[in-house]
């Protein structure tokens, strides 16, 4: 059978995404949609969540996270939505984890950084 074209109705980029705020880390982010991609000028094939706010002097700002950066991986888990990212952060916090490894796309480069979460 021929590979079918993905159904345009279920295109990830059209899913309306809720903004998630992680107050204790000082981070706010949303899933990637057509709108957020064009707003932050991000490549089409990039997956993850885009940072919409970073609180001053927070764990997030100390780690070097900036608005418009994309978190594509948390603790080596690929992130596809804001809810999923929140769950990974919540699970890490429940386990008492002090920091997580993030893969972040910033200024056209992908890099890893450590984010303290408590």
Please place each PLM-identified region on the residue numbering.
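C-terminal recognition in membrane/secretory proteostasis and scaffolding
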Residues: 1-118
